[in-house]
Amino acid sequence: MGKPGFSPRGGGGGGGGGGGGFRGRGGGGGGGGGGFGGGRGRGGGGDRGGRGGFGGGRGGGGRGGGGGGGRGAFGGRGGGGGRGGGGRGGGGRGGGGRGGGAGGFKGGKTVTIEPHRHEGVFIARGKEDALVTRNFVPGSEVYGEKRISVETNGEKIEYRVWNPFRSKLAAAVLGGVEQIHMPPGSKVLYLGAASGTTVSHVSDVVGPEGLVYAVEFSHRSGRDLINVAKKRTNIIPIIEDARHPHKYRMLVGMVDTIFADVAQPDQGRIVALNAQHFLKNGGHFVISIKASCIDSTAQPEAVFAAEVKKMQADKLKPQEQLTLEPYERDHAVVVGVYRPPPKQ
């Protein structure tokens, strides 16, 4: 039986093997939208594979079902994880459908690590490729992600797979963003840190010389964040409302980059306030915008354009914008510079 201890009973027989181990005994009508593996029935094995990414069973087609891992970065061999490995479910942990474990980093396979053009980010090339960061705390994981150990020049280095379905920043990197402005040794103010999933990877990227100030308002997520920070000396957790930067001004020094993923209607203002307090002139910002959080009635494109206009008024000069398809719907990432020095 799979990890969660229940087994949704659909109509008809036919035992499908869902990714994360939901045995989905349903036949016929495919796995529910939540992506419990659809049975062997005619249905779309696992209806889009659900963003939870427990891959559809051996059923036909469905965007995440039997027909091979979808578009994502690490899909399983035979009907692997949801829209490409493992969606938010965490790197397709269960063996996807018929195939082997989604991810292809089973022992014995030769995995080579290449540096990504963003310093501190790497690509693991194996049976399937994945985005990885060098683990700051070897031997421990943060949210159940896969770890890969590679031996170079006699020393073992451990990397953690960075899942674009769980992290907006990873989605932006895989989407081809030009700059993330977080080289090793830089100081980053991270607004909307949640449980510390992405924060842990930023901590990997900036490395032992860098610092991540992680601001999160929710006490529930804050507890997880503090637990992540206990092991990672370069994360400073701040459980405070990002709307009131003066409350944590004693904790935060000047930073090189602000990353914001706050999903609030006034997030442009939140970033501007924090930039005025902590961002050095010529420093950069990376903002993840969720259109439906700002105006759920307008077209996403119109929302993004309006936000960019607001930023310009606050001396935040956007330099690039890209949407996060296929990893997130109606999300965009805007990267830019704060108070750029006048051109000579």
From Swiss-Prot:
Residues 1-113 are annotated as: Disordered. It catalyses: L-glutaminyl-[histone H2A] + S-adenosyl-L-methionine = N(5)-methyl-L-glutaminyl-[histone H2A] + S-adenosyl-L-homocysteine + H(+). The modification Asymmetric dimethylarginine is found at residues 9, 23, 25, 40, 42, 48, 51, 58, 63, 71, 77, 83, 88, 93, 98. Signal peptide: none annotated. Residues 8-107 have a biased composition (Gly residues). Pfam families: Fibrillarin. S-adenosyl-L-methionine binds at residues 197-198, 216-217, 241-242, 261-264. Keywords: Methylation, Methyltransferase, Nucleus, Ribonucleoprotein, RNA-binding, rRNA processing, S-adenosyl-L-methionine, Transferase. It comes from the Eukaryota. GO terms for cellular component: box C/D methylation guide snoRNP complex; Cajal body; dense fibrillar component; nucleolus; small-subunit processome. It is found in: Nucleus, Nucleolus. Its EC number is 2.1.1.-. By homology to other fibrillarins, some or all of the N-terminal domain arginines are modified to asymmetric dimethylarginine (DMA). It is an enzyme of class 2 (transferase). GO terms for biological process: box C/D sno(s)RNA 3'-end processing; rRNA methylation. GO terms for molecular function: histone H2AQ104 methyltransferase activity; RNA binding; rRNA methyltransferase activity. Belongs to the methyltransferase superfamily. Fibrillarin family. S-adenosyl-L-methionine-dependent methyltransferase that has the ability to methylate both RNAs and proteins. Involved in pre-rRNA processing. Utilizes the methyl donor S-adenosyl-L-methionine to catalyze the site-specific 2'-hydroxyl methylation of ribose moieties in pre-ribosomal RNA. Site specificity is provided by a guide RNA that base pairs with the substrate. Methylation occurs at a characteristic distance from the sequence involved in base pairing with the guide RNA. Component of box C/D small nucleolar ribonucleoprotein (snoRNP) particles. It is associated with the U3, U8 and U13 small nuclear RNAs. PANTHER family: FIBRILLARIN (PTHR10335:SF17), RRNA 2-O-METHYLTRANSFERASE FIBRILLARIN (PTHR10335). NCBIfam families: PRK04266.1-2. This is rRNA 2'-O-methyltransferase fibrillarin. It comes from Drosophila melanogaster.
